[in-house]
A protein has these predicted regions:
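Basic nucleic-acid-binding alpha-helical/helix-turn surface characteristic of O6-alkylguanine DNA
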Residues: 1-103, 151-161
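Flexible interhelical turns and helix-capping residues at alpha-helix boundaries
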Residues: 86-89, 113, 117, 141
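Regulatory, non-catalytic segments
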Residues: 104-119
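Short Lys/Arg-enriched helix C-cap and helix-to-coil transition segments
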Residues: 120-127
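…primarily DNA-binding HTH/wHTH and HhH modules…
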Residues: 130-161
Length: 161
């Protein structure tokens, strides 16, 4: 699916960038990496959850603690609502806006997904257009979004019923 760069702190994961190449993932982090230590052992539990997810455990990513400090209340609400979408299922931007407490804020819901700091972990790939189209996906493009949805559906076939 691509390369992931993780940035964490005492209050949990601060960022996760999923991009097609390592260089793109690092560049996506930008200045957030300034002053960061390279400590792969700090993410042992996160990596374990990612491996379990890739092996078909649709709830594994729910265990990863996230640090939402500095995030607007609407984005926090939208990200939490997105996290509640079960693996193998999709919801519309309209649904997301309503769940975040602002039913008419579909564009803002789209912006919350576009600015998702936690690629894959907040599963914005599960949010699609009301007409069933994929919408957008900054975590590697629409091809990656489609593959993630197909993988989840294959691992959770009861979601298709």
């Amino acid at each position: 699916m691509g390369w992931m760069v993780l940035l964490g702190g005492e209050d949990g994961l601060k960022r996760a960038s999923l991009k097609p190449t390592p260089q793109e993932a690092i560049e996506d982090m930008g200045m957030d990496l300034d002053g960061a230590d390279d400590d792969p052992d700090a993410f042992t539990e996160v990596v374990e959850c990612l491996h379990r997810y890739a092996a078909g455990d649709g709830t594994a990513l729910d265990e990863i603690g996230l640090d939402f400090s500095g995030i607007t209340p609407f984005f926090s609400a939208a990200w939490n609502a997105c996290r509640s979408i079960p693996a193998g299922e999709t919801r519309s931007y309209a649904w997301l806006a309503a769940e975040a407490g602002s039913p008419l804020a579909m564009r803002a819901a789209g912006q919350a997904m576009a600015r998702n700091r936690f690629s894959l972990i907040i599963p914005c790939h599960r949010v699609i257009a009301s007409d069933g189209g994929l919408g957008g996906y900054g975590g590697g493009g629409l091809g990656v979004k489609a593959r993630l949805l197909q993988m989840e559906l294959r691992e959770n076939p009861e979601s298709a019923e």
